Regions:
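Phosphate-binding site recognition
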Residues: 1-204
């Protein structure tokens, strides 16, 4: 079950309401970034892409698959895309009057595969996504790379973000209130897990 994260969800929903939100979410592994994102997008028109260490061509192919499933256009998965801008254009053109969320999870993997990806994304945001009812969410566990390529002054994406969330372990009060535990049991569990959601699963 989803626990806590009230302020983070409020931030994401506020960004959805603005003209063009660009949110960067980062934090250590297993702290619940993907769970937070999936809770946020569950009732929204969203394109969710999880990057991996695969080749750029494979990433584009899978991204096209995400577009195909979300737009219910099977032809998109049959097209061989060679330009990220064309893929992002599909997102922009989908339901132009409806707010959409585009999530790129584990964004640093795309940068590792193609160091120019931040520049490509900057161009896509400025030219294709920003004025087309799209909220962009970049997420990653490699904190140093997220800071360097999404937040730093010398990153092509600098100045684009409208919000950033460094996701921390859950607060004790959230853990205690969400579970049917005595206070002593909750303290013991929190001492062992540190409020890291993935570790808390072992107690379910």
């Amino acid at each position: 079950d989803f626990i806590g994260r009230t302020s983070e969800l409020a931030t994401l929903n506020a960004e959805l309401e603005r003209g063009s939100g660009f949110v960067v979410i980062y934090g250590r592994r297993r702290v619940g970034k993907t769970t937070l994102i999936k809770e946020f997008i569950k009732d929204k028109r969203a394109f969710y892409f999880l990057a991996t260490t695969e080749s750029e061509a494979q990433s584009m192919k899978r991204f096209a698959g995400v577009l195909s499933r979300t737009t219910k256009n099977p032809m998109l998965s049959k097209v061989t895309f060679t330009d990220w801008l064309d893929l992002f254009q599909v997102v922009a053109d989908d339901h132009p009057d409806e707010k959409k969320v585009l999530v790129i999870d584990e964004f640093p993997y795309l940068v590792k595969t193609n160091p120019d990806f931040p520049s490509i994304l900057q161009n896509a945001w400025d030219e294709v996504l920003k004025d087309h009812n799209v909220m962009l969410v970049l997420c990653g566990s490699l904190i140093s790379m997220m800071k360097k390529h999404a937040l730093a002054y010398d990153s092509p994406l600098y100045g684009r973000r409208t919000a950033q969330i460094r996701l921390m372990p859950l607060q004790f009060t959230d853990v205690y209130e969400a579970q049917n535990l005595s206070f002593e049991q909750a303290v013991e569990q929190y001492a062992i897990t540190g409020g890291v959601p993935k570790y808390m699963e072992f107690f379910q």
